[in-house]
């Protein structure tokens, strides 16, 4: 049952731009599966699904390959370990880090390929992230907050 459901989830995600757990649950119900929000949440975690930005500014679930998932987790851990605070100035995000961690955190940000970040410059405890537009800056800050707080 679980294997079949999770296979169906992967299939649905590859065919549809699914933004929320509710959308995924609705599609699973239409496909004949009885699911709860807790089941969906557990499946998302076990399948290592993540959200990425689409071209129209929305988000969708995708399945990371094992290599991408493992590396992504390492970069997120570096981000969490080094992060102190962040603030925005127009289309620039200033990230404060633990002393000596700015280079590692900036490299992690670059490696995560977060939509909207043009590039990062790091000092000892401060990173300047250039963002494409002001609205993108707000979106990137939200994504970073989710990553840092454990909500991919």
From Swiss-Prot:
It comes from the Bacteria. SUPFAM superfamilies: C-terminal domain of arginine repressor, Winged helix' DNA-binding domain. One of its GO terms (cellular component) is cytoplasm. Keywords: Amino-acid biosynthesis, Arginine biosynthesis, Cytoplasm, DNA-binding, Repressor, Transcription, Transcription regulation. It is found in: Cytoplasm. One of its GO terms (molecular function) is DNA-binding transcription factor activity. GO terms for biological process: L-arginine biosynthetic process; protein complex oligomerization; regulation of arginine biosynthetic process. It holds the Pfam family Arg_repressor. Pathway: Amino-acid biosynthesis; L-arginine biosynthesis [regulation]. Its main location: cytoplasm. Regulates arginine biosynthesis genes. Belongs to the ArgR family. This is Arginine repressor. It comes from Lachnoclostridium phytofermentans (strain ATCC 700394 / DSM 18823 / ISDg) (Clostridium phytofermentans).
């Amino acid at each position: 049952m679980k294997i079949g459901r999770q296979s169906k989830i992967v299939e649905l995600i590859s065919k549809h731009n699914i933004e929320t757990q509710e959308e995924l649950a609705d599609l699973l119900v239409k496909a004949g599966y009885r699911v709860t929000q807790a089941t969906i949440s557990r499946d998302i975690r076990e399948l290592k699904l993540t959200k990425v930005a689409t071209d129209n500014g929305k988000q969708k679930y995708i399945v990371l390959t094992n290599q991408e998932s493992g590396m992504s987790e390492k970069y997120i851990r570096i981000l969490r370990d080094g992060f102190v605070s962040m603030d925005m100035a127009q289309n620039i995000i200033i990230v404060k880090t633990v002393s000596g961690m700015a280079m590692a955190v900036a490299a992690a940000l670059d490696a995560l390929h977060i939509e909207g970040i043009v590039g990062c410059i790091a000092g000892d405890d401060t990173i300047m992230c250039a963002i494409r537009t002001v609205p993108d800056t707000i979106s990137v800050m939200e994504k970073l907050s989710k990553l840092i707080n454990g909500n991919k």
